[in-house]
Amino acid sequence: MTVSGTATGVRVRIAPSPTGEPHVGTAYIALFNYLFAKKHGGEFILRIEDTDATRSTPEFETKVLDALKWCGLEWKEGPDIGGPYGPYRQSDRKDMYQPYAQELLEKGHAFRCFCTPARLEQMRETQRAAGKPPKYDGLCLNLAAEEVTSRMAAGETTVIRMKIPTEGSCDFTDGVYGEVSIPWDSVDMQVLVKADGMPTYHMANVIDDHLMKITHVARGEEWLASVPKHILLYRYFGWDQPVFMHLSLMRNADKSKLSKRKNPTSISYYSALGYIPEALMNFLGLFFIQIAEGEELLTMDELSEKFDPENLSKAGAIFDIQKLDWLNGRWIREKLSEEEFQARVLTWAMENDRLKEGLRLSQTRISKLGELPDLAGFLLKSDLGLQPSDFAKIKSPPEEILEILNTVQPDLEKILEWNVETIEAELRAIADRMGKKLKVVVSPLFVAVSGSSRSLPLFDSMAILGRSVVRQRLKLASQAVAALVGSK
C-alpha cells in the first residue's frame, strides 16, 4: 500500500451523512482513518456530506459529531472547529461546485439530461424485466447544443450526467482488495448535479477530497463499485487521485449485513446502555490488528502502535455483542480506578438529562425516595428481561398485541425529531390508522418500554430513553409476545 502523501503529508477524512442516528459502522470507518493518520503522523479531518437535502438535518449532524467525540476521536479540521480548507459542510460549499460542473460540460465530459423521473422509472422496469441491471440508456447523451439551449430556455428540468467510456475496463489498485478491474460497460452515466443544483455524492466527494488535499480514501466496501466513476472524474479534471482502501462491511454473527433490524447499530444506543467509549473503540480496533489471545485489552495508543493496514482482511468484520460485553466488562474492572468508575457512573446517569428528567417525572408520583428504583429504574437498565408472561396481564389478546408492536416499530422510524410531542402525535396517528383506541395501542408499549404496565408517562419515557433504546426494547418485546402467541 502506498503511504506517502503530498507535500502536506498524509491526510485522511471521515465524511458521514447526517441522515439518521450515528451508526457504529461510521465509528468503525472513522477509527480506521484516525489510526491510519496517527500511525503515519498525518491529519484526520471530518467533513459533513449533506447533499441529500431531504434527509439531512442539523439535529442528526449534531448527533454525529457528539457520537464521534464520545468515541474519543479528535479531528484536526471540521465543521465545528474550521480549518484552512473549509467550509467542511457540503451544503455550505454549493457555489464552489458549479465551475467544475461547467468545466466538465465545456470539455465534453458531461452532458445535460432532460429525462423525467417517470421516464427513468419506466426505463429501469424494462431493463429489469429483460434481466439487465438498471442504468441510464443514454437518450440525452448526444443532444445537439441548440436543442439543449432551447429546452433549458423553455424551463425544462435538467440534471448533469457524466460520460462513461464504452469499451475496455477501469483497472486500479485498492489498498485492501489489490488489483481490481471493472468493465466500463457496467458503469452507469452517473448524475453529477441534481435538478436543484446540488452535486451528488460522487461529484462533491471527488472535488472536496482534491481541494482538501486528501491523500488516502478509506471507506466501506460498498463504494468499491463506484471507484471507476471517481477515477474518471480525477482524469477529467487532470488531478492526481488518492490511494483507495475499501474496508469489509461489519456483519452480524450469521454473516448478514449489520442492520438495526437484527442488532442495535446506533452509537447512542451503546452510550445509553453504559458501554464505555474506550471499550467500544478497543473492540472495533481489533478488526485492524493482529494479536495473540489474551492481548485484547488495548488503549487507543496501543491500537495505534499495533495498527497495520497491510494485513486487513476482506472477510466481513463480525460485530459480536457478547465479545463487546466481555471487553467492556474487562475495561470496567481492569482499567478504571474506583474514583474513575464512580465518576463514569455519575456522568452516564446524568447524560442527556436521563436521570434529571426521570426525577422530575417521579417527584409527584412517590411518597418515599425508596420507591424511585421501582418507578424509574427502567431508565437506567440495559436489559428489562422481558418475558412472555409480562404481557399476559394486558386485556388485548396476544395476537393483537403482536400486531400493535409490529406496526408501531417501522412507523416510529418515520419520526425526524424525537421528542414527547412527535412521539405522541405518531402514536395517535397509528391508533387512528389501526382503528383502535389510543389506550389499546399504548398498553403493550408501557410494558415494552418500562417492563411494567404502571410506570412514568409513556411518551416522556420514550423521549428520555431515546430512539435507539426504544427500538431495541420494542424488538425484544415483539419476540416475547411472539413466544406467547406460539405457546397457545
From Swiss-Prot:
EC number: 6.1.1.17
Motif 'HIGH' region location, chain numbering: 16-26
Domain of life: Bacteria
Keyword Nucleotide-binding: yes
Alphabetical GO biological process terms: glutamyl-tRNA aminoacylation
Record key words, sorted: Aminoacyl-tRNA synthetase, ATP-binding, Cytoplasm, Ligase, Nucleotide-binding, Protein biosynthesis
Enzyme class: ligase
GO cellular component: cytosol
Catalytically driven reaction(s): tRNA(Glu) + L-glutamate + ATP = L-glutamyl-tRNA(Glu) + AMP + diphosphate
Disulphide linkage map: none
First-listed, main subcellular location of the protein, grouped into a coarse class: cytoplasm
Binding site for ATP: K260
Gene Ontology MF: a single term: tRNA binding
Short motif 'KMSKS' region, span: 257-261
Cellular location(s): Cytoplasm
Keyword NAD: no
Matches recorded under PANTHER family: GLUTAMATE--TRNA LIGASE, GLUTAMATE--TRNA LIGASE, MITOCHONDRIAL-RELATED
Family: Belongs to the class-I aminoacyl-tRNA synthetase family. Glutamate--tRNA ligase type 1 subfamily.
Subunit structure: Monomer.
Name of the featured protein: Glutamate--tRNA ligase
Organism: Rhizobium johnstonii (strain DSM 114642 / LMG 32736 / 3841)
Classification of source organism: Bacteria, Pseudomonadati, Pseudomonadota, Alphaproteobacteria, Hyphomicrobiales
